[in-house]
Amino acid sequence: QHYDAAMSDAFFDDLGMPKPNVYLGVGSGSHAIQTAKVMTEFEPIVLEHKPDWVVVVGDVNSTIACALVCSKLGIKVAHVEAGLRSRDRSMPEEINRILTDSISDLLLTTSQDADENLASEGIPSQKIRFVGNVMIDSLLEHLKIAERSTIREDLGVPDTDYAVLTLHRPSNVDDRAIFSGILGSLIAISERLPIIFPVHPRTKAKIEEFGFKDSINDSNIRLIEPLGYLDFTRLYSGA
């Protein structure tokens, strides 16, 4: 739900992954619009290829949209990162997780507590498989490569004593009062510890909308463009 073309391309390039064979062209939008568009664009692909299984990953709008399409067509769904719960139903991701798990045929989990969450929700044990955390696998696979990045030198950040910030969840940045409170705390922290802030496009738009740019510029928070996977890994590993 936070799609940005430049950020998406950077991940494929950094991780050495082939570009998608099919691009649905949905982009950003409200939760309802994005979910509906993914469903209407994805269904013809499924009808054409007639897969036995479809694998969906994570907790974003495309996850639940594709799972719904397959469930209605009688195609089996495997959900990677199943069973994760925040217990906060105000989060769009939490709704996506719960609904996707409830209609998936194979639930691939990252941790024991995810298994326990699914069991407590009545998911049969034969549907649950603990497979580990693909995000950690990716990190370990690319950590040595990320060490070659020159991002810290390019930005001129010190070897130690700096923080890295990410902030983009709607619950944190869409409400002016909430965002202002978070920003006030960050500005106070930046007086003791400089903060490097790769700004997500939707957060950047909210900073402009709420008139926070001057406050940030007057602080020790440094705004930079979003980073690719390897540069970001190098940056936060030294923070």
Question: What role is predicted for each listed range?
Answer:
Residues 1-3, 108, 195-201:
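Short internal beta-strands
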Residues 9-11, 17, 147-238:
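Donor-nucleotide binding loops and adjacent catalytic segments primarily
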Residues 82-86, 133, 221, 226-229:
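Short, acidic/turn-prone active-site loops that include or flank metal/cofactor-
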